[in-house]
Swiss-Prot record:
UniProt GO BP: ATP synthesis coupled electron transport
TM region positions: 12-32, 37-57, 70-90, 101-121, 124-144, 159-179, 199-219, 230-250, 266-286, 293-313, 321-341, 361-381, 393-413, 438-458
Any Pfam family the entry gives: Proton_antipo_M
UniProt protein name: NADH-quinone oxidoreductase subunit N 1
UniProt GO cellular component terms: plasma membrane
Subunit structure, as described in the record: NDH-1 is composed of 14 different subunits. Subunits NuoA, H, J, K, L, M, N constitute the membrane sector of the complex.
Family matches, as InterPro entries: NADH-Q_OxRdtase_suN/2, ND/Mrp_TM
Organism whose genome encodes this protein: Thermodesulfovibrio yellowstonii (strain ATCC 51303 / DSM 11347 / YP87)
Reactions this protein catalyses: a quinone + NADH + 5 H(+)(in) = a quinol + NAD(+) + 4 H(+)(out)
Amino acid sequence: MNISQIPLQVEALIPEITLTGFASLILLAGLLKLKNEVLVWSSVLFLVIFAFFIPSFEGEAFNGMFLNDFLTIYLKLIIIIGTIISLLVLTSYLKEKLIRFNESIAFILFSALGMMLLVSARELISFFLSFELMSLSIYVLVGIRRYDVKSNEAAVKYFMLGGFSSAIMLFGIAFIYGATNTTELSLILKVISNYNPLILIGLGLFIVGLCFKIALVPFHMWAPDVYEGAPTPVTAFISTLPKVAILGAFGRVLVEIFRDYYIDWSNFLIVLSIATMATGNFFALIQKNIKRMLAYSSIAHAGYIIIGVIVGTQSGFNSVVAYMFIYTLMNIGAFAMVIAFNEESIENYKGLHKFHPALAIAMLIFMFSLTGVPPTAGFIVKFNIFLQAVKAGFTWLVVIAVIFTVISAYYYLRIVMYMYMKEPVKLPEPIYSRELEVAILICTIGVTFLGILPLFLI
């Protein structure tokens, strides 16, 4: 049978089906007692090859329940690149902490699978199930250090609050179904032209459930404790890629499907954006632990990113996608540096450039990019979001965001000042591994090169 004649058009989901099989094999590989390096590099090689073939699978699957178009494929490539870097970062940590490789790698792959399905979903039940596949895998990853109390506490807290947010989102889907008699987004678009309070309630609950995962204030309380308690590579993973998937899917649903309710959801998101930028930046100022500082920093960045969704145009949404790509590189890179330095106290970063100049330069680049200092890529994507907001008439919101960006410079550049302008108080013992060095190099080159030559970022 020709592949184009497969019932329900499953060929568009062949990449996801292949990834499911590979992740299952990695999970079973523990029985074969393969070398850890074999598991890691075979996974990386698989994902690299996987990325080359993904653009070949455009179209619909399962009668329109999933859609692969240019934007979806772009989001999937970001997820794959982030997953590759996360696997490389995870490797050195697993070696150091003696954690089982096959389980950690498999659950990262299953989580990435959920994210890829999420950005393709064009039906609310498929959206929810993809969301849960991503979430359940992450809960396991957060608690992968089985005998670490902080890791276990973080996993339980994340699981309990995550389950609560999923219930709220599912309740919202039920309201939308009750008002439209369908869960297919294409059909919902046809029947929501008349203003319906039931749809508005459902949409509000749906947004609240998703806001939990991207840590928008006031749904952020889990983030600092979970980010601090989780293994550092897992923190890097969950602080970036789930946001790519959720904002990619969530932003598109709002902009394309619920356009008639733009005033309602945009006003709600404006309040959340301002509260998120304020809370994230002000709490980051007082942190002494770099993982908690980066946790609050990621909350603040969620506030900036949402501005692109608030714009409500395709160009605004495109700026969100570009921001998420660069945010993935610079945030995973920053957490990779925390692993490399093997030190979480900000005080102990003093004078690092004297003993580890290459690592200090990489950290400087990531801090500059997170701040939005030119010519880093972080400046380009933040400027692009602000530009789209100004064009849409949200100049006042951009002014507020710029003020908070200036505030953020204090805690980011404090790290740089400590590394270059303070005398060392403690000599860290960096963790060196081939995989970690490759990950840091990829992130550093990406953030620097795409800042000088933005290419597709604008």
